[in-house]
């Protein structure tokens, strides 16, 4: 597994250096008005679905709100709509409002995020506009001063890590250390080891852990979700795609196959970015959904988090050309 992961990670970070592009240009595209109409329609649908219990809860009440609305979120297509609005449609409108300097569009999309928060109690959804705008400002500043953003982020993370290690003996330092190092960086590695040990003596899923595959094949060999099965019910944490779609699916071959799929996806992203006259738009629009790739199945990332939908929009919908043209290269 170590050798496979080494090759996979080298491929992951080296894709951008390979001058290979997929032919994805589409000549006839839909009007962007269609996206606005779909966004409004889904918003009205969700407001109707959650109409009995929507409120602007403070951070001490959000878990109660989540529990109260859990049945609504998990029923039918509601959960997908929540993710698609939070990861695709509202960010798309927000970014276009920022780049096109349209304050009305920006504030309407922010209202959309607030409505989603009132339905789900998810703090991440409420903070998405701030996170996206901060990334936009950082990217714009790095272009202005001609600084490599990747190197800047590496330096910032390194300095932040050193700072945390210096104050880890304090209560605040311990809390930040547990959140940053353990929850953000170490859980994926710990779960990978657990999955490797578990599937040495238990049957692989052969991708039947994916809901749609299991509905077609009925091959899923366990009675509960993978996160609970592997840990014997002790936890239910989402694992990295190399773990769920790799080790759990079919061992070594699973890691190899999902790595190939990931590389093809990255080639597709590079091809889409190359066709767009404003590649900063392409970079930022993937930010909300990109965070999900760190702790979920790649197929969940594509479908539930709306990445496949976002790619289809970039390929088949005419993005307005009056956005402020900023090129990163």
Where are these regions (language model features)?
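Membrane-anchoring hydrophobic segments
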Residues: 1-94, 100, 140-164, 257-329
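Small-residue-enriched transmembrane helix-hairpin modules in multi-pass membrane proteins
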Residues: 62-76, 80, 161-267
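Internal alpha-helical transmembrane segments
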Residues: 97, 104-130, 134-171
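Helix-loop-helix junctions and helix-breaking kinks within/between transmembrane helices
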Residues: 1, 111-136, 247-254, 296-305
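Short, hydrophobic/aromatic alpha-helical segments in well-folded domains
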Residues: 93-94, 113-114, 242-245
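Short hydrophobic/aromatic segments of transmembrane alpha-helices and their interfaces
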Residues: 106-110, 236-238, 282
């Amino acid at each position: 597994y170590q050798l496979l992961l080494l090759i996979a990670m080298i491929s992951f970070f080296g894709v951008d250096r390979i001058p290979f592009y997929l032919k994805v240009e589409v000549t006839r595209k839909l009007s962007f008005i269609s996206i606005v109409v779909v966004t409004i329609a889904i918003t009205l649908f969700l407001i109707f679905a959650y109409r009995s219990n929507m409120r602007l809860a403070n951070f001490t009440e959000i878990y109660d709100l989540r529990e109260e609305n859990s049945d609504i979120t998990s029923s039918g297509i509601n959960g997908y709509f929540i993710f698609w609005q939070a990861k695709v449609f509202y960010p798309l409108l927000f970014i276009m409002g920022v780049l096109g300097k349209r304050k009305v569009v920006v504030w309407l999309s922010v209202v959309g995020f607030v409505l989603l928060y009132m339905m789900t109690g998810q703090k991440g959804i409420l903070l998405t506009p701030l996170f996206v705008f901060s990334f936009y400002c950082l990217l714009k500043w790095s272009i202005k001063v001609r600084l490599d953003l990747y190197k800047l982020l590496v330096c910032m993370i390194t300095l932040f890590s050193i700072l945390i290690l210096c104050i880890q003996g304090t209560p605040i330092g311990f809390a930040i250390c547990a959140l940053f190092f353990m929850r953000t960086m170490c859980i994926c590695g710990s779960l990978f080891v657990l999955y490797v040990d578990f599937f040495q003596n238990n049957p692989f899923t052969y991708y039947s852990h994916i809901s749609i595959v299991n509905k077609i094949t009925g091959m899923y060999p366990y009675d509960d979700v993978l996160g609970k099965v592997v840990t014997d019910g002790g936890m239910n944490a989402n694992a990295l795609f190399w773990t769920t779609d790799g080790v759990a699916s079919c061992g070594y071959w699973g890691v190899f196959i999902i790595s190939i799929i990931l590389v093809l996806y990255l080639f597709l992203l590079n091809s889409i970015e190359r066709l767009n006259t404003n590649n900063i738009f392409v970079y930022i629009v993937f930010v909300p959904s990109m965070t999900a790739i760190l702790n979920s199945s790649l197929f969940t990332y594509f479908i539930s988090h709306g990445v496949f939908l976002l790619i289809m929009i970039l390929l088949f919908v005419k993005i307005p050309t009056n956005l402020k043209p900023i090129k990163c290269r």
